[in-house]
Amino acid sequence: MALVNAEKPEVGSSPSSLGPRNKSWVLLMLRFVAFLATAAATIVMAANRETKTFVVATIGSTPIKATVTAKFQHTPAFVFFVIANGMGSIHNLVMIAGDTFVRKFDYKGLRWVTVAILDMLTAALISGGVNAAVFMAELGKNGNSHAKWNKICDRFGSFCDHGGAAIIASFIGLLLMLVISIISIIKLLKPKSPLVDSHVLAP
């Protein structure tokens, strides 16, 4: 009688060999769409400006005009919005490159831990940026009668429309980042089934 060490095959290893690869492609597609959404939000808000000329006074029959330009740089919340979505775009671009070219390099699962943490931080950053922009957008659309802040969207309609489109794109990117974060955490917590050595009696 001799003892022979036999490796126990992983359950479902052969029929589901395409499963992890398909899941990886799904995650890559989610990251790519999230990149497009946050990049669109960044570009639209960063390029958002509108110039209008208003009559501010009249001396006799001569109107006094003033030219005013609305730009995202005038509002710190919109500046933060551009920075947050820009960093979210860079994050997803780096993650896509990492999954595509350096997937094989993983030291004791450290890669998945780092990816999960960065995904959560990026989602939190985008959430802060878009919510700050929503607050200022609501203030620009409706004003605040208690603080005597006038609305501006009745005068700068194009500026507000472009800002609203950027906010919608950012919310899409945020939703996708939340889904990506959940997938990253599931990948991190999912136990891996190592090969189990079993002793088989051989005649």
From Swiss-Prot:
<feature type="transmembrane region" description="Helical">
    <location>
        <begin position="77"/>
        <end position="97"/>
    </location>
</feature>
<feature type="transmembrane region" description="Helical">
    <location>
        <begin position="25"/>
        <end position="45"/>
    </location>
</feature>
<feature type="topological domain" description="Cytoplasmic">
    <location>
        <begin position="187"/>
        <end position="203"/>
    </location>
</feature>
<feature type="topological domain" description="Extracellular">
    <location>
        <begin position="136"/>
        <end position="165"/>
    </location>
</feature>
<keyword id="KW-0472">Membrane</keyword>
<keyword id="KW-0812">Transmembrane</keyword>
<dbReference type="GO" id="GO:0005886">
    <property type="term" value="C:plasma membrane"/>
</dbReference>
<comment type="similarity">
    <text>Belongs to the Casparian strip membrane proteins (CASP) family.</text>
</comment>
<feature type="topological domain" description="Cytoplasmic">
    <location>
        <begin position="1"/>
        <end position="24"/>
    </location>
</feature>
<feature type="transmembrane region" description="Helical">
    <location>
        <begin position="166"/>
        <end position="186"/>
    </location>
</feature>
<comment type="subunit">
    <text>Homodimer and heterodimers.</text>
</comment>
<dbReference type="InterPro" id="IPR006702">
    <property type="entry name" value="CASP_dom"/>
</dbReference>
<keyword id="KW-1133">Transmembrane helix</keyword>
<dbReference type="InterPro" id="IPR044173">
    <property type="entry name" value="CASPL"/>
</dbReference>
<dbReference type="InterPro" id="IPR006459">
    <property type="entry name" value="CASP/CASPL"/>
</dbReference>
<feature type="topological domain" description="Extracellular">
    <location>
        <begin position="46"/>
        <end position="76"/>
    </location>
</feature>
<dbReference type="Pfam" id="PF04535">
    <property type="entry name" value="CASP_dom"/>
</dbReference>
<keyword id="KW-1003">Cell membrane</keyword>
<feature type="topological domain" description="Cytoplasmic">
    <location>
        <begin position="98"/>
        <end position="114"/>
    </location>
</feature>
<feature type="transmembrane region" description="Helical">
    <location>
        <begin position="115"/>
        <end position="135"/>
    </location>
</feature>
<protein>
    <recommendedName>
        <fullName>CASP-like protein 1B1</fullName>
    </recommendedName>
</protein>
